[in-house]
Amino acid sequence: MDQEQERNISRLWRAFKTVKEMVRDRGYFITQEEIDLSLEDFKAKYCDSMGKPQRKMMSFQSNPTEESIEKFPEMGSLWVEFCDEASVGVKTMKNFVVHITEKNFQTGIFIYQSGITPSANKILPTAAPAVIETFPEASLVVNITHHELVPKHIRLSEAEKKELLKRYRLKESQLPRIQRMDPVALYLGLKRGEVIKIIRKSETSGRYASYRICL
């Protein structure tokens, strides 16, 4: 196996670990063992005898934890798929959407290598009420939420959001905003109208919280 292939496998392994962490951070059940998968075990499990990654085998389903269902009763199961094809066309995306809708997944996460054609992107809304999210592999090689400058973000339930607005006598329009395309919003799968609590460290008061609404 040449160095370039080794590098690519290492990047894919890191992206796979980030996806597992992302799914866990959204409140789905992922074991620590899955996240701690070593590079050697990853190769043994997901690469063929020639050392070529078999991305289809990396796909997985995850269900919400009991704690998540208590906080977000409407939360459903999720399906993650890594695409074998370098460029994603209409047929591949149609198959993915059919899988998500037929199996009644609430969320489908589609990880692609280099690009999705505009025609394929137009198919995504047809999965409604399910939500399809797409991520390029390269964006997942590093988990952005692990960066020391990125504070902890926690998604609030509808009840927590109402309590927050009531406590501070605020309207939704008065809350600071976070864009839906913000990297952390994408990581957490935030939807319009949802509020996140951001916990930052402070030199004077230890920790303090601020809130943002997703638009």
From Swiss-Prot:
Q: Which residues form a coiled coil?
A: none
Transcription listed as a keyword: yes
| GO BP term (any one) | transcription by RNA polymerase II
Against InterPro entries, the record matches this protein to:
Arch_Rpo5/euc_Rpb5, RNA_pol_Rpb5_N, RNA_pol_Rpb5_N_sf, RNA_pol_subH/Rpb5_C, RNA_pol_subH/Rpb5_CS, RPB5-like_sf
What coarse category fits the chief subcellular location reported for this protein?
nucleus
Q: Which UniProt keywords apply?
A: DNA-directed RNA polymerase, Nucleus, Transcription
Where, subcellularly, is it found? Nucleus
Could you name the Gene Ontology cellular component terms for this entry?
RNA polymerase I complex; RNA polymerase II, core complex; RNA polymerase III complex
**Molecular function via GO:** DNA binding; DNA-directed RNA polymerase activity
Function of the molecule: DNA-dependent RNA polymerase catalyzes the transcription of DNA into RNA using the four ribonucleoside triphosphates as substrates. Common component of RNA polymerases I, II and III which synthesize ribosomal RNA precursors, mRNA precursors and many functional non-coding RNAs, and small RNAs, such as 5S rRNA and tRNAs, respectively. Pol II is the central component of the basal RNA polymerase II transcription machinery. Pols are composed of mobile elements that move relative to each other.
Annotated PANTHER family: DNA-DIRECTED RNA POLYMERASES I, II, AND III SUBUNIT RPABC1
Q: Which family does it belong to?
A: Belongs to the archaeal Rpo5/eukaryotic RPB5 RNA polymerase subunit family.
- Self-association or partners: how does it assemble? Component of the RNA polymerase I (Pol I), RNA polymerase II (Pol II) and RNA polymerase III (Pol III) complexes consisting of at least 14, 12 and 17 subunits, respectively.
Name the UniProt record assigns to this protein? DNA-directed RNA polymerases I, II, and III subunit RPABC1
Species name for this entry? Kluyveromyces lactis (strain ATCC 8585 / CBS 2359 / DSM 70799 / NBRC 1267 / NRRL Y-1140 / WM37)
| Gene expressing this chain | RPB5
